[in-house]
Regions:
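Soluble periplasmic/extracytoplasmic beta-strand elements of cell-envelope proteins
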Residues: 2-10, 83-89
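Pro/Ala/Gly-rich low-complexity, hydrophilic intrinsically disordered segments
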Residues: 72-166
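Short, well-ordered alpha-helical segments
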Residues: 4-57
């Protein structure tokens, strides 16, 4: 089953288009993963694994790949916007196999949980940096953008690692 989500990001004065794309992708990805989690829970044998909601969220995110399928740049009330549509394909049988493998291997389960926790913390850092950037002067904006770029790179690195783990 293919699940899609769309999110629109309003660019601030200190946002580049690339920054906006990454910020928008994080939000759209979160939306599509939440929808996928509902599908997985309703159409699978996940209940037999006796997973907590946090475990289900972490393991589902680790087993799914999200891709951008559409990007639109626009103008709304005098501000630039970037709208992304993302998708993930949910093969419940494949997800169940991966979930079973994760649950069966406590080392892998711990590693996946740690990666997802790190991603959530980094996403929180992005939001904090975004808030600071929205009121930053031109003098401090460059340093904040560089810091945010490093956080984006760290998130991407963790995303790549989870694909290897599963």
């Amino acid at each position: 089953q293919t699940i899609t989500a769309t999110h629109t990001y309003i660019l601030g004065d200190n946002d580049s288009r690339n920054d906006a794309r990454q910020l928008c992708f994080l939000q759209a990805k979160q939306q599509v993963l939440e929808q996928a989690e509902s599908v997985i829970q309703s159409q699978s044998i996940v209940t037999n694994f006796e997973l907590t909601k946090d475990q289900m969220t972490s393991y589902s995110a680790a087993t799914l790949s999200v891709e951008i399928v559409k990007e639109d740049v626009g103008l709304s009330n005098g501000q630039y916007t970037l709208t992304l549509t993302v998708k993930t394909d949910v093969d419940v049988d494949q997800v169940n196999s991966l979930l079973a493998a994760i649950v069966a291997d406590t080392t892998l389960a711990d590693r996946v949980a740690q990666q997802q926790q790190q991603i959530r913390e980094l996403e929180g850092q992005v939001q904090t940096l975004n808030s600071r950037l929205s009121v930053a002067t031109s003098g401090t904006a460059n340093a904040l953008r560089k810091e945010r770029k490093v956080v984006f790179e760290n998130i991407a690195g963790l995303d790549r690692m989870q694909l290897v783990a599963t």
